[in-house]
């Protein structure tokens, strides 16, 4: 057992040489208090000490006196008048922590959320009412349709992806519903071109699409334009002529860049 240090002057004020306890010589299993010539002292509320005038080891006597003194001191402490809450620490936080902006320059695809990318199914036709149809495995053309031919028009799955946003501009990706094909913009022979690109259906669409797949959907009154995010000022366009391929134009000449968008049920 560790030795009990000598009591300080502050503690000895609560110490009395009369505060002695007695143990039987048979050992601790038969420990009891001896009340020969005993006095009953009430030191404080909840603390009562029975004193015996028997000879006993001084160190143990000091230990008992120390316990009594600590109890008396504890009762002299003023009780807390309010419950300690998280708000009590708030004024200290600025001295402990320093706010720094979180800047994320890169994105790790492995840590992206597996939440489905928001999307809408829609059809497009230009302001001359030409519809977009899939004429070859990887080519869109614009032509007038009517009656039963309307079911030839392609249905787009328009996904809302990461990119620059404003009041009238929304970054989207345009995939063909039911097919692993997406419109993309690439450079060929020194000129931006529009193409249908085949993708892995298990990986696409995703929230952060490669920039060649992203179009800025710009709303103007009742029409929309689709500007390439990869090549600013280049738009999905149709020709004035019938049955011509959909292409990427820079709004020069007679190219049509204004479309009507119609939402369709899933």
From Swiss-Prot:
Propeptide feature: residues: 1-114
PANTHER family: INTERLEUKIN-1 BETA (PTHR10078:SF30), INTERLEUKIN-1 FAMILY MEMBER (PTHR10078)
Residues marked Important for interaction with integrin (site): 169, 177, 179, 188, 202
Name this polypeptide is given: Interleukin-1 beta
Transmembrane segments: none
CDD domains hit by this protein: beta-trefoil_IL1B
Keyword Cytoplasm: yes
Organism: Cavia porcellus
Protein's cellular compartments: Cytoplasm, Cytosol; Secreted; Lysosome; Secreted, Extracellular exosome
GO cellular component: cytosol; extracellular space; lysosome; secretory granule
Subunit text: Monomer. In its precursor form, weakly interacts with full-length MEFV; the mature cytokine does not interact at all. Interacts with integrins ITGAV:ITGBV and ITGA5:ITGB1; integrin-binding is required for IL1B signaling. Interacts with cargo receptor TMED10; the interaction is direct and is required for the secretion of IL1B mature form. Interacts with HSP90AB1; the interaction facilitates cargo translocation into the ERGIC. Interacts with HSP90B1; the interaction facilitates cargo translocation into the ERGIC.
Role this protein plays: Potent pro-inflammatory cytokine. Initially discovered as the major endogenous pyrogen, induces prostaglandin synthesis, neutrophil influx and activation, T-cell activation and cytokine production, B-cell activation and antibody production, and fibroblast proliferation and collagen production. Promotes Th17 differentiation of T-cells. Synergizes with IL12/interleukin-12 to induce IFNG synthesis from T-helper 1 (Th1) cells. Plays a role in angiogenesis by inducing VEGF production synergistically with TNF and IL6.
Miscellaneous comment text of the record: IL1B production occurs in 2 steps, each being controlled by different stimuli. First, inflammatory signals, such as LPS, stimulate the synthesis and promote the accumulation of cytosolic stores of pro-IL1B (priming). Then additional signals are required for inflammasome assembly, leading to CASP1 activation, pro-IL1B processing and eventually secretion of the active cytokine. IL1B processing and secretion are temporarily associated.
């Amino acid at each position: 057992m560790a030795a009990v240090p000598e009591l300080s002057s502050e503690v000895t004020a609560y110490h009395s040489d009369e505060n002695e306890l007695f143990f039987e010589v048979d050992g601790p299993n038969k420990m009891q208090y001896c009340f020969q010539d005993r006095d009953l002292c009430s030191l404080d509320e909840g603390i009562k000490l029975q004193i015996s005038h028997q000879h006993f080891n001084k160190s143990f006597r000091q230990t008992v006196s120390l316990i009594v003194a600590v109890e008396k001191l504890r009762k002299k402490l003023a009780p807390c008048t309010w419950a300690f809450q998280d708000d009590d620490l708030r004024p200290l936080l600025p001295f402990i922590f320093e706010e720094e902006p979180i800047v994320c320059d890169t994105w790790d695809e492995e840590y992206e959320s597996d939440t489905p990318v928001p999307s809408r199914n829609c059809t497009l036709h230009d302001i001359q009412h030409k519809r977009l149809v899939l004429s070859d495995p990887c080519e869109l053309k614009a032509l007038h349709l009517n009656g039963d031919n309307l079911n030839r028009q392609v249905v787009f799955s328009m996904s809302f992806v990461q990119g620059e946003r404003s009041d009238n501009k929304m970054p989207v990706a345009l995939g063909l519903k039911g097919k692993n094909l997406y419109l993309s913009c690439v450079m060929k022979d020194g000129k931006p071109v529009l193409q249908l690109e085949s993708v892995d259906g298990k990986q696409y669409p995703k929230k952060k699409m490669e920039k060649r797949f992203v179009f800025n959907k710009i709303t103007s009154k009742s029409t929309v334009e689709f500007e390439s995010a990869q090549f600013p000022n280049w738009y999905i366009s149709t020709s004035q002529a019938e049955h011509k391929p959909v292409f990427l134009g820079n709004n020069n000449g007679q190219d049509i860049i204004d479309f009507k968008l119609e939402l369709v049920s899933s």
